A protein has these predicted regions:
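Intracellular juxtamembrane helix-capping segments at the cytosolic ends
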Residues: 34, 124-137, 333-348
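Glycine-rich segments within core transmembrane alpha-helices of 12-TM secondary carriers
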Residues: 63, 143-165, 360-371
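Helix-to-loop junctions at the C-terminal end of transmembrane segments
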Residues: 66-81, 279-292
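Juxtamembrane intracellular "pre-TM" segments in multi-pass secondary transporters
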Residues: 1-9, 196-230, 419, 423-427
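Helix-loop boundary and gating motifs at the non-cytosolic
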Residues: 2-60, 226-262
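A membrane-interface helix-boundary motif in multi-pass transporters
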Residues: 46-48, 83-85, 166-181, 375-395
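A late C-terminal transmembrane helix in Major Facilitator Superfamily
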Residues: 350-380
Length: 427
């Protein structure tokens, strides 16, 4: 097995730019463009919320399926062929094409179909760029690369929404800007970053596949690991409930004009992101020093729950700002310390990468379920109060489920996975 050499600043810079483009084109439509595109008149605004939940739901499902499939196919590239670059370029181009299609689409079905194409493209390119971390970086640089992915997520949503709002772009022009961004930066980064040909190694035998399947079942049977997964899933649903419908809440819950609501959405996103980053850094340091990740993870869910209570009790923009800060604090701490806690609980060191992938899928599933559930709750009561109450309750339930997982007596000193944290989801 060849020894991986450290990469330089150029590699890290290009890699970070690639992820900045990916996060920007993925999160800007979710938070701003799709809600504006699917928004309906005040007399029938609930149908717009339901349509948005539907579109985000089917898009998220497509992405969850496409990412692992694309990753597995790129792993199986023929001997001597490039494994990651073709998929990264193909995903970037597919994303750009369907962003344009989405911009010209009208109605929930057409927009939903086009958005599925976008999420598949994003998932394919994300899988390819993520694989570069394991392919090309030594263990001493993987944490830095993962931190670059996470920080670019935080910057990406602010950058995307900020460009559209501050430049005064319409919905279609916003999509065209995003398409150009991913086409240029995504493909450019894929061409610049090295992609060594697939090594000459025999394919895994069928028996190994069977053993992997058995070990997967064993991971789910591990008591503490299973409780942690359930807690992570439910907490992420609570986070998605509290953040996915922010623009609709400003428009129809607080009855703000569209231009004012867009400006205020940008402000909420900046506040949320600032506190996510702050909490991530501080709690990461504290958890490394104390080792008591379980307690910190549970406390984070309590802070997240408080944000839902604030909006439900005091539905004003000022209270929403406070709630965004609390949500950022809670989820920033949960996403960082929660994954470090998950790393402590991984059942078998032979399956760390696979089991950590399962942990990350639970976060993605939560962000998929949240908008759909939120749209249903809005339709049920004709308002937003139940959405935020449910966000608070689910956050508390997530903390209770996490509490059922026992803190290991001696946390491993060799796992640097707390740096590979599941980064904050979009507000």
């Amino acid at each position: 097995v060849s020894v991986l050499k450290r990469v330089g600043a150029r590699w890290m810079t290009v890699f970070t730019l690639a992820w900045l483009a990916i996060w920007t084109v993925q999160l800007t439509p979710v938070q701003l463009l799709l809600p504006l595109q699917l928004n309906t008149s005040d007399d029938d605004w609930i149908s717009g919320v339901v349509s948005s939940g539907f579109v985000l739901g089917i898009g998220g499902l497509a992405g969850i399926i496409a990412g692992p499939v694309a990753g597995a196919l790129s792993d199986r590239a023929g001997i001597g062929r490039r494994r990651r670059r073709p998929w990264a370029i193909g995903g970037a181009i597919l994303t750009a094409v369907f962003l344009v299609v989405t911009g010209f689409s009208e109605g929930p079905w057409a927009v939903g179909g086009a958005w599925v194409g976008v999420t598949i493209g994003v998932a394919v390119s994300s899988a390819a760029f993520t694989a570069l971390i394991a392919d090309q970086l030594p263990a001493t640089q993987r944490g830095a690369a993962s931190a670059a992915v996470g920080s670019s997520q935080a910057v990406g949503i602010v950058l995307g929404v900020g460009l559209v709002v501050l430049l005064g772009l319409g919905i279609r022009d916003g999509y065209l800007l995003l398409a150009a961004l991913i086409a240029v930066i995504g493909t450019g980064a894929a061409l610049i970053l090295p992609d060594p040909p697939a090594p000459v190694e025999p394919a895994p035998v069928a028996q190994a596949s069977v053993m992997n399947d058995r070990r997967l079942l064993a991971s789910f049977r591990d008591r503490d690991f299973a409780w942690m997964l359930w807690g992570r899933l439910v907490t992420n649903i609570g986070n998605a409930l509290g953040t996915a419908l922010f623009l609709f809440f400003l428009l129809h819950g607080l009855h703000q004009e569209s231009v004012v609501a867009q400006d205020n959405l940008l402000l909420l996103i900046v506040v949320y992101t600032l506190f996510v980053v702050l909490a991530s850094v501080l709690t990461g340091i504290v958890s490394d020093r104390t080792g008591n990740r379980r307690t910190l993870t549970i406390l984070a869910t309590l802070v997240q729950a408080a944000s839902g209570v604030v909006i439900a009790v005091v539905p004003t923009f000022e209270a929403t700002m406070i709630a965004a800060a609390l949500m950022g604090l809670g989820y920033g701490a949960f996403s960082t310390v929660g994954l470090a806690f998950a790393a402590d609980l991984l059942p078998d060191e032979k399956d760390h990468a696979r089991d950590l992938g399962i942990v990350n899928v639970t976060a993605a599933l939560g962000q998929l379920i949240g908008p759909v559930l939120g749209a249903g709750l809005v339709a049920l009561v004709g308002g937003f109060w139940l959405v935020f109450v449910a966000a608070a309750v689910l956050s508390l339930v997530g903390g209770a489920l996490t509490a059922l997982a026992r803190q290991p007596a001696r946390p491993s000193q060799d796992r640097d996975l707390s740096q590979d944290h599941a980064q904050p989801q979009e507000p």
